[in-house]
């Protein structure tokens, strides 16, 4: 989720989780036929800030002998990036590795020293790992049991949702409850990344309702900086804050904000600019694994899914025009 996705799903004690397991997913399945646009907003709700920073958060340890020696920066092999759309900036190697690394524990260890040295991109991507793996790592046994229960329901999207959750389980398998991956940690890492200069992290904080500054001038300036950057991760991080939650705000981008279509347009623009919106990417996986919002076509990417299920035919032209406007301006350095 946060997203590249952000999310604010609450962590529950394992006992409570286990006791309500089947009924919870039964309700989710029953609601699967409701308006997808509203469900998309729910799945992408930004992370909530903690009431106060916890000084004794348990961070994933730098070295765990039982989990292998993965502390070096070269521990995750470089993976060839997918081709970006024409005119879009190529994704950084760290972003490509986040999307494609089969072991996110090893990936997190490989970029830890760079994050500790204050590199904004490394801190931001650590927050993405923590967000992606938080639900699994808080209770791996219960998570696996839920996955089996969902698959056993044999509903139209059961197989897709079970598959997405299995991808999360596989990639996050070496994280454990004692690592303390929760959404307080995600929020604190994103504050750290934003203060270090990460535009996607800064955008995610604005989308969560906890911007670095609370003035309308700051908000308008940040939206403008994201637009000029043409950074797909910044677009994706900002998208939840550009939907109906921004209705009525004054800014130079008001025509590109304040409606349900606006949120989708920002995310679709991120896809065009090079965000991994493929069927197995983190965006589609998080929608499906965390929110039960899954395509029945296992090969369908985010754009195909949205146009099929979330945008009425008469609204497609409006969204197309918004996306064109969002990606049309020339990229400028930040």
Feature map (PLM): residue ranges:
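Short helix-capping/linker turns of helical repeat alpha-solenoids
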Residues: 116-123, 130-133, 137, 145-178, ...
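Primarily a tetratricopeptide repeat
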Residues: 109, 188, 221, 265, ...
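Terminal, low-structured helical/coil segments at or just beyond the last alpha-helical repeat
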Residues: 276-334
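N-terminal, positively charged topogenic segments adjacent to a membrane insertion site
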Residues: 1-22
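Juxtamembrane proline-rich low-complexity "stalk" or linker regions positioned immediately after a signal peptide
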Residues: 9-14, 47-89
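Extracytoplasmic intrinsically disordered, low-complexity "stalk/linker" and propeptide segments
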Residues: 72-117, 123, 137
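Hydrophobic membrane-insertion alpha-helices, especially the h-region
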Residues: 25-42
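Mature extracytoplasmic/lumenal regions of exported proteins
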Residues: 244-298
């Amino acid at each position: 989720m946060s997203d590249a996705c952000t999310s604010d799903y609450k962590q529950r004690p394992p006992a409570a989780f286990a006791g309500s397991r089947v009924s919870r997913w039964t309700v989710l399945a029953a609601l699967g036929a409701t308006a997808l646009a509203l469900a998309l907003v729910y799945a992408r709700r930004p992370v909530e800030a903690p009431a106060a920073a916890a000084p004794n958060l348990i961070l994933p340890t730098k070295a765990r002998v039982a989990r292998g020696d993965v502390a070096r920066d070269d521990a995750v092999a470089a993976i060839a990036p997918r081709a970006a759309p024409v005119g879009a900036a190529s994704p950084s190697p760290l972003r490509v590795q986040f999307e494609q690394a089969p072991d996110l524990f090893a990936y997190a260890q490989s970029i830890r020293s760079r994050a500790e040295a204050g590199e904004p991109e490394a801190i931001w991507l650590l927050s993405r790992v923590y967000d992606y793996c938080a639900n699994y790592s808080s209770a791996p046994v219960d998570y696996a049991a839920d996955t089996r229960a969902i698959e056993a329901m044999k509903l139209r999207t059961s197989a897709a949702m079970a598959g997405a959750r299995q991808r999360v389980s596989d990639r996050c398998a070496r994280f454990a409850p004692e690592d303390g991956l929760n959404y307080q940690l995600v929020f604190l890492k994103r504050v750290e990344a934003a203060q270090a200069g990460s535009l996607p992290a800064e955008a995610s904080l604005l989308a969560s309702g906890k911007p670095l500054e609370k003035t309308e001038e700051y908000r308008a300036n940040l939206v403008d900086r994201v637009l000029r950057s043409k950074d797909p991760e910044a677009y994706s991080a900002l998208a939840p804050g550009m939907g109906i939650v921004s209705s009525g705000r004054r800014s130079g981008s008001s025509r590109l904000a304040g409606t349900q279509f606006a949120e989708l347009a920002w995310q679709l623009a991120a896809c065009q600019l090079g965000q991994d919106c493929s069927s197995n990417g983190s965006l589609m996986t998080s929608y499906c694994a965390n929110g039960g919002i899954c395509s029945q076509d296992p090969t369908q990417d985010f754009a195909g899914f949205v146009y099929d299920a979330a945008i009425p035919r008469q609204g497609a032209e409006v969204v197309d025009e918004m996306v064109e406007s969002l990606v049309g301006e020339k990229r400028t350095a930040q």
